[in-house]
Amino acid sequence: MKNIAIIGLSSFGYYLCEALNEHGFNLMAIDLKPDLVNQVKPFVRKAVIGDARDKNFLMQLGISDFDTVIISV
C-alpha cells in the first residue's frame, strides 16, 4: 500500500486523512497546530507537530521515502 504524507491539517487536510485511511493508505500527517494533529490521530499511522517549511525537519521524518506528499495549506 502507498505511503502518503499530508502537510496541513485544516478542513481539507483532515478530510483527506479520513478518506485515504478508509481506503487503507499508510498516512503521516504534519501540522504546526497540536489540536489539528490530535484530531487526525485516529486516521493516520503517524501524526507530527512541526514546521514543514523546515527541510531538515522533513528529512528527519523520512519524507523522501513517501510515495506521495500532499500539501494542503
Model feature map: region roles:
Residues 1-73:
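Cytosolic regulatory regions of ion transport systems
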